[in-house]
Amino acid sequence: MAISDLLNRRVRAVAQDDEELYSDQSGSDQASDDLRSDESGSESGSDGSLDEDDDDDVSQGDPEDMDDDDDDDDDDDEDDEDDNDDAQDDVQASLSSISFGALAKAQASIGPKSKRSSKASRTEDEPAAPSPLDDIRARIQEAREQKRQALAKNKDSEKLSRSSKHAPAVQSSKHAVSRKRTIIEPPSVPKSRDPRFDPTVLSQGGRGNPQGTSNAYAFLDEYRRDELKQLKEQYAKTKNQEQKEALKRTIRSTQDRLRAMENRKREKEILAEHKKKEKQLIREGKKSNPYFLKKSDLKKQVLLKKYENMNSKDRTKALERKRKKTAAKERKEMPMERRALAGDDAPSGGGRWRLETPQSCIDVGTCCLISAPGSCYCI
């Protein structure tokens, strides 16, 4: 009964996940069993040596004593055999009382270990056979390595070139991305700025109120006039022709700039007066809708006001300049045979036509073609 209790207590089914753990434990148990067997062998060896000593002593003794000892040994052997028979009977009785479940558990626990041990011994004895999958993997790895090396060589050897000199340059769109990322933008360094173009100034009085801006920077007009006066004095003192030509161009550009600014100022004044009159007429009820000036009407009023503010000498010079400008413009638009030239110079044609510009036609700003003496055809 002791053996059945021992088997029922220690034997249990082994799960597949714990096979390695139990295999390690079984290995440790086998090692401990080997150690125990060695110790028992050493003890039996020592017992054997003692028995040999006793036999030697007995052999040295009397033969009668030896006979008595032999009889005693025979009796002891018979007793031992009887004891062994009783023990075997007890073991068989206990095994017959063991349940089939306990035997199945014991067989399940012993079976896989023996298979694993046999497989391990076979693998240790027999060399590992080459697998076809390993060969395929090795070939694929070699092919990839060769392809990588070929691509590296091509990149080094080939240079970006154009098919012709007229073709656009070839540039790769692949660029390495920097590992650094701007998480927080640093504060911008303040730059020097012109207050005339400052958005804060323009928002307050620039675009919304141009009149306020012009009034705020009215002192610049005085600076420009002083600068023009200094340029004229320097032009009078300079004797070098190159410097005189440069000063002359600068003076002309400055005068044109001042003249354009005066014209714009005059236009603003005329528009302001016209708006004021129209508002007054609407307020009085004489008009229901305001009249907006056209560009041509505005230009005429600006020119009229400009000539009114001039003295007689300046007005004459301005009219003469305007007349020459208009005549030259109309002359360019005419054919070569009808262009008016000074004196008796005729255009290329041998003098068949005589071109003149009578004073009466010049006053109205037109040119005439004189085909015969005494006849004038105004265009």
From Swiss-Prot:
Subcellular location: Nucleus, Nucleolus
InterPro entries: RRP36
Keyword Coiled coil part of the UniProt annotation: yes
Entry keyword set: Coiled coil, Nucleus, Ribonucleoprotein, Ribosome biogenesis, rRNA processing
A GO biological-process term: maturation of SSU-rRNA from tricistronic rRNA transcript (SSU-rRNA, 5.8S rRNA, LSU-rRNA)
Listed GO CC annotations: 90S preribosome; nucleolus
Assembly and interaction partners: Associates with 90S and pre-40S pre-ribosomal particles.
Protein name: rRNA biogenesis protein rrp36
